[in-house]
Amino acid sequence: MSVFVTQVYRRFSDLDPLGHVNNVVYLDYLQEARLRALMQIDYADTLKFSQVMAHQSIEFRRPILYSTDPLTIKVTISSVGKTSYRMKYRIFNELGELAAEAESVMVCFDNDKAVPIPDKLRSALQSILEVE
């Protein structure tokens, strides 16, 4: 599996005064997709070790409006380093149009310093590593 796909639903409270999903809500969608991806690759210890986000970026391609239809989020791992890994996300609206692209870098962390990625997590991440 090189791409993990999940769906999230918008809530009316996600909207800004213009009727668009507010930019900060995208981070919630990405967090949900990230956790689901890690759980899907059978890394059950996902919530049992410390990770910190070192980087997060979002490129907004088109507004997301309210709909009861789900958004589709595709998640890939683009690189796995010694202490960190990079995830890429693509959010599609209900018409299949690309609404946003995002990237995050997660760092394994313990006692105020970066630590090597646990072997079990490394293997799980490599199962959805996207080879360019």
Describe the residue ranges of each PLM region:
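Hot-dog-fold acyl-thioester-processing enzymes
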Residues: 1-55, 109-132
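HotDog/MaoC-like acyl-thioester-processing domains
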Residues: 1-3, 65-67, 78-132
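Hydrophobic residues positioned within well-ordered beta-strands of beta-sheet architectures
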Residues: 6, 54-56, 71-73, 87, ...
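Intrinsically disordered, low-complexity segments enriched in small/polar residues
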Residues: 24-27, 58, 83, 87
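Hydrophobic beta-strand-centered segment that forms part of the acyl-chain substrate-binding groove
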Residues: 37-72, 76-79
